[in-house]
């Protein structure tokens, strides 16, 4: 890339930087980007850049692969049903240890190394994420969000800190739950009136034809997104991600994006370029 191209890119980004300065963007960090050092470092720099130009990023993370690694080290076999982790009390203790004590702090350290200031918390802090058992409780301590109490985030964001939130919630009685990070991100985005919800995934976005990379849906709306699910254009793991976006938009989030986290700087490409890189869903 020559100097002219660099200047052109900066020029293209300027109106987006101006538009989103001071706005909150909730980003779900997960998938391959968490396991590849180059992708991780690019993500940390992207978050730092967003913060530097005045955007207010809030990062929600899971950590499935890291949880599985620690379960295996402790000779516990991970168990799943319909894509959900079966979470007994012993597994829940490991989930909390890994997400809150290891994955969360690795993200904080990575962002802080760029010169920005991140603060790691979980849904337990300030009762940020209240939860209950999912469905009939057959998955154990897998939970769903009942309420978001975002007040703890306000002083962090107002002072320029970047909140990094692990997707653990609890009941008012103190029972912890492991919650799907996509849905946590969507509920937090709605609760804080975020400008955008962005899900980093291991797919390009919504494809009209499952195995056709050229069939990417670059922009769609709530009605079409629901139709994609009903007509089984969106299937398998993309269903909960799309549903999460639909729910967030229905609660007032202005735009939701499903993007390919396997591409370096995909976050900046989606936010600061005309063409974007994934699927944007609007109300």
UniProtKB/Swiss-Prot annotation:
It comes from the Bacteria. It is an enzyme of class 2 (transferase). Keywords: Amino-acid biosynthesis, Arginine biosynthesis, ATP-binding, Cytoplasm, Kinase, Nucleotide-binding, Transferase. One of its GO terms (biological process) is arginine biosynthetic process via ornithine. Its EC number is 2.7.2.8. The record marks 28, 241 as: Transition state stabilizer. Catalyzes the ATP-dependent phosphorylation of N-acetyl-L-glutamate. This is Acetylglutamate kinase. It comes from Prochlorococcus marinus (strain MIT 9215).
């Amino acid at each position: 890339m020559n100097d002219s191209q660099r200047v052109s890119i900066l020029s293209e980004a300027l109106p987006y930087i101006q538009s989103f300065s001071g706005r909150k963007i909730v980003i779900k960090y997960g998938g391959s980007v968490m396991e590849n050092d180059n992708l991780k470092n690019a993500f940390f720099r992207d978050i730092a850049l967003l913060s530097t130009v005045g955007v207010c990023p809030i990062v929600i993370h899971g950590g499935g692969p890291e949880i599985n690694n620690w379960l295996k080290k402790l000779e516990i076999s991970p168990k799943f049903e319909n894509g959900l982790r079966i979470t007994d009390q012993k597994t829940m203790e490991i989930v909390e240890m890994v997400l809150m004590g290891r994955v969360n702090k690795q993200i904080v350290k990575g962002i802080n190394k760029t010169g920005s200031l991140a603060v790691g918390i979980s849904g337990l802090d300030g009762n940020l994420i209240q939860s209950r058992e999912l469905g009939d409780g057959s998955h154990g301590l897998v939970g769903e969000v009942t309420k978001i109490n975002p007040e703890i985030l306000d002083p962090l964001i107002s002072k320029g800190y970047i909140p990094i939130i692990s997707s653990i919630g609890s009941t008012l009685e103190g029972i912890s739950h492991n919650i799907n990070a996509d849905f946590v991100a969507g509920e937090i985005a709605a609760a804080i009136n975020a400008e955008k919800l962005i899900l980093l995934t291991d797919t390009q976005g919504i494809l009209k034809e499952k195995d056709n990379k050229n069939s990417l849906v670059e922009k769609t709306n709530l009605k079409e997104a629901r139709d994609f699910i009903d007509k089984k254009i969106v299937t398998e793991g993309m269903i909960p991600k799309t549903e999460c976006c639909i729910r967030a938009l229905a609660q007032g989030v202005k735009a939701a994006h499903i993007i390919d986290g396997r591409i370096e700087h995909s976050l900046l490409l989606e936010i600061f370029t005309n063409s974007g890189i994934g699927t944007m869903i609007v109300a």
